[in-house]
């Protein structure tokens, strides 16, 4: 039994994308999630009627969920699609790794989930929606995991859309361009810290009694290394 939410993508026209805001939501993981088949919670015929409906434009803590819960959570939504449509689902800021299923088929994964955890910087991705010969409904499911230091996991505001594939590609392009500009700024910042740290250590070598130059130089170098390590997680 599925009672919603339902997004009507058959009305796409003047607005080439629709924000996926209302989802069925559940904390925890499917009991068969690490098996060889499709997890039961990812199947289109799974009864999600007892799952609460949440909105991604609000913090989970503001919707009755405790802050700081670690581990897994699941999102489910139904999308009505027209026949022979060229549509895609867009996911951007999802903390921190996830799998996405469309009608029970795993169509993508970002990062690594337990038992093979691999956390990455968030980024935007597009997942094509299956083309149907007749108008119908597909079920999109997102399984999300976050390390306890990053909890709570979940889909951030303004990070989930469905729409014409060309419009979704443009939305992703804009996100990646903004992300690129941010990364350039971080690299420049790391470079400045590196230079400052080296200069301060050089000054310390000439004034060994002034140990504040040593500590300040090491602080700049540490900040530079931390920024560099963070940027290496982006792809």
PLM-predicted stretches and their roles:
Residues 1-63, 78, 139-177, 197, ...:
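Accessory carbohydrate-binding/adhesion or oligomerization-edge regions at the termini
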Residues 48, 82-84, 131-137:
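A short, structured loop/turn motif at beta-sheet edges
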Residues 51, 79-102, 140-142:
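Aromatic-lined ligand-binding clefts that engage carbohydrates, nucleic acids, or primary amines
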Residues 59-65, 75-76, 122-128:
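Short structured motifs
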Residues 69-82:
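Short beta-strands within extracellular/lumenal beta-sheet-rich domains
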Residues 101-157:
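Beta-strand-rich ligand-recognition modules
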Residues 164-188, 228-235:
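Alpha-helical transmembrane segments and their interfaces in multipass membrane proteins
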Residues 189-204, 211-235:
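Hydrophobic alpha-helical transmembrane segments of multi-pass membrane proteins
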């Amino acid at each position: 039994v599925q009672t919603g939410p339902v997004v009507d993508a058959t009305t796409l026209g003047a607005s080439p994308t629709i924000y996926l805001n209302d989802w069925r939501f559940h904390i925890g993981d499917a009991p068969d999630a690490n098996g060889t088949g499709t997890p039961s919670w990812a199947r289109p015929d799974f009864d999600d009627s007892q799952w609460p409906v949440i909105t991604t434009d609000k913090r989970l803590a503001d919707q009755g969920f405790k802050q700081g819960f670690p581990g897994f959570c699941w999102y489910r939504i139904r999308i009505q699609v027209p026949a022979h449509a060229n549509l895609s689902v867009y996911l951007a800021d999802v903390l921190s790794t996830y799998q996405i299923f469309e009608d029970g088929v795993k169509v993508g994964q970002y990062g690594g989930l337990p038992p093979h955890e691999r956390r990455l910087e968030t980024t935007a991705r597009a997942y094509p929606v299956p083309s149907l010969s007749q108008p119908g409904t597909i079920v999109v499911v997102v399984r999300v995991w976050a390390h306890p230091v990053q909890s709570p996991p979940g889909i951030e505001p303004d990070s989930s859309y469905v729409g014409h594939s060309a419009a979704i590609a443009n939305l992703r392009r804009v996100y990646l361009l903004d992300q690129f500009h941010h990364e350039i700024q971080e690299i420049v910042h790391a470079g400045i810290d590196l230079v400052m740290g080296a200069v301060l250590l050089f000054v310390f070598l000439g004034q060994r009694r002034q140990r504040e130059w040593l500590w300040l130089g090491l602080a700049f170098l540490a900040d530079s290394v931390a920024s560099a390590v963070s940027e290496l997680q982006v792809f």
